Amino acid sequence: SSAASDVYKRQALHYGLKDLQAQETRDLDLLWERFTYHLQAMVECVKAGYDKHYEVMQRNRPEIVLNLFMHGPIERGLNCSNGGVDILDLNIDGIALATVADSFAAIEQRVVEEKKLTWDRLFELLDTNYEGAERERLMLKNIRRFGSPGSRAQDWAVRIRDYYVALCKGSPTRKHHLMIVPGLFSHGDVYAYGKTLEATPNGRFAGDAISHSSEPDPGFARGVDTFSPVLKANAVALTQAGYGNSAPLHLDIDTGLIQHSGGVDALVALIHAHEQAGGTLINMNCVSKEKLLKAHEDPKAYPDLVVRVTGYSAFFASLSKEYRQQIVDRFLDE
């Protein structure tokens, strides 16, 4: 039996920044301490919810059909979510890894090391949603972000992943001693999650989408580190939670890339390399950029276009504008 719930790393960062803003002495170590404090509170809250789930699901939503397909519920006379089976797959999905990792890296570089911004100025920028401060916003955004090999943001992503996994796996739920499986999966709701989130230190405006699952943000690698699907695949493989609960890789490839000689072989090699590096799930679309943009502008003109969203497929025309936009945003044409 399985169930899943999300832990919002972006909210832990938000509350951590608010805590730090109220302090007279501010440093990166204190921000990390406050971030981990709130992240732990969120994980414990989800665990408590699973204890409650274990007690009430058999009364409110028994698995009448699925119970018949498992060994245990009939023999024990118990619903699968209440002791009827030996294995309960209770998941916690972390989200916005890149949003948080890039934010920590931007603070470390621009505030702590280079001192191009003070802590007070950083908080002012966040509180005013970067109003009239585009230069400073871009300065925070244009660091070597998560996904760039050897970047400080990548180091932060691994550190955050490790702490989050330890919180999930370090102890079972308090009441019924249920084990939790950590993962990193935003289920496509990056706009919904970002809508109520204030500006973040990675240059993201208030209300903008957060990053997908454990993926780098679109456009993460520029200049020397030319953007490529390989860098994205490596970053996602590097930050897997490690217990089988997936952290998906979205690959949206222009058909022009695979129509050239060797293109298909290169794509097959990328898929195999990602899986061998520890990847757990690939959501892939191969469609021309021109067709995708036209379908986004006029979905009804392309009623038969099917796309992989995130963990499931759907007719592109059936998706909301926000869901279509995230597919366009992550589209890879380089």
Residue ranges with predicted function:
Residues 81-108, 316-319, 323-324:
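Conserved phosphate/anionic-ligand binding catalytic regions in large, soluble enzymes, centered on
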Residues 55, 59-63, 70, 164-318:
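Catalytic alpha/beta core of large soluble enzyme barrels
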Residues 44-82:
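N-terminal low-complexity, intrinsically disordered segments
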Residues 50-53, 78-82, 115-211:
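Internal maturation/activation junctions in enzymes
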